[in-house]
Amino acid sequence: MKNKIVFAPIGQGGGNIVDTLLGICGDYNALFINTSKKDLDSLKHAKHTYHIPYAEGCGKERKKAVGYAQTYYKQIIAQIMEKFSSCDIVIFVATMAGGTGSGITPPILGLAKQMYPNKHFGFVGVLPKATEDIDEHMNAIACWNDIMRSTNEGKDISIYLLDNNKREKESDINKEFATLFNDFMNMSESHAEGVVDEDEISKLLTMKKSNVILEFDDKEDIQVALAKSLKESIFAEYTTNTCEFMGISTTRVVDVEAIKSIVGYPRRTFKGYNSKKNIVVATGIEPQKTTVQMMNEIIEDKMKQRREVTSKSENMIIEPIALDDEDNKSVISSNEKEISIDNVEKEIDINDFFSKYM
């Protein structure tokens, strides 16, 4: 299954996620795309890279990134689709708050989907922390809207929406997603009691709309363990209690109905066993619009803070000290003569005058 997938991370954040995945398992295909050559050079496991010609980063400017996409879309898509023509599944990866990944990914994904209708496309997107700035949140919302517009509101692709608020460090999100995704792909490893096989993994992987991957500890009550796993998950929260397909791979017999009651009721379930971890993959969930929409509230709060600070800003005009009448009279009645511009160098030592300001 792994050799059927090509990851197309765009920008620094997306590149770091896939670089982490390749560090865990080098069997995946990947083409790293960036406007910054320095970011590409910093990757540890990248075999295939594409630097946007003449670009030196986007400075979190989405419009600039969209401009690069418009100019170089043929080259970008050709690099992915021709170099990895045997791959049936193309997964774009980007952090949504920046410039390069946020701006380039939606149009390239939308175009590639139209150009290659027989391929399956996915998107791994990362939402910003609440502490990030207004522009980052604006970028993330714009990226989400562009992805929704170019993919029939998420109905044409698989989405893995991660939330940086769920962990202190972004690197923790990267490592956890990489581990979860790789465990998902390994569910078909042999077990005497049966496994979730390759065909079933393919069905889970190519199901449209949003997907989540969970792991839970079976040392405590399964519903308690799963509720905890779902609450602490790196994936953006979803509000529906249904999904299309569910994959369950556990180390022992578990109450499947208890899992469904927490994660969501599927149309079809694939059940198997493994010797290492308890994994649940829920696919075909409605995209997490509510979570993304909450960023508008964050933006409003930050703008309100800025307005309050601006309204308290100190007046920059300095009021001069008024002179008393005698001083005023002495200035007015001064007998000193004016100096014309033509004679200034004769009357004033210019070098000495300006030396006081050096």
UniProtKB/Swiss-Prot annotation:
InterPro entries for this protein: Tubulin/FtsZ_GTPase_sf, Tubulin_CS, Tubulin_FtsZ_GTPase, TubZ_C_clostridia
Binding site for GTP: N182
Residue positions binding GDP: Q12, G13, G14, G15, N16, T95, G99, T100, G101, E132, N164, E170, N174
The entry's keywords: GTP-binding, Host cytoplasm, Hydrolase, Nucleotide-binding, Plasmid partition
EC number: 3.6.5.-
Pfam family, one: Tubulin
The protein's enzyme class: hydrolase
GO process terms (BP): microtubule-based process; plasmid partitioning
Record-level GO cellular component terms: host cell cytoplasm
SUPFAM superfamilies xref list: Tubulin nucleotide-binding domain-like (SSF52490)
Gene3D superfamilies: 3.30.1330.150, Tubulin/FtsZ, GTPase domain (3.40.50.1440)
Transmembrane feature ranges: none
UniProt subcellular location: Host cytoplasm
Record's comment describing the protein's domains: Consists of two domains: a nucleotide-binding N-terminus that hydrolyzes GTP and a C-terminus domain necessary for polymerization. The domains are bridged by a long, central helix. The C-terminus is thought to insert into the most distant monomer of the plus end of the filament, forming the complete active site and modulating filament assembly.
Further remark: This bacteriophage also exists as a circular plasmid prophage in its host.
Protein name stated in the entry: Tubulin-like protein TubZ
Annotated gene: tubZ
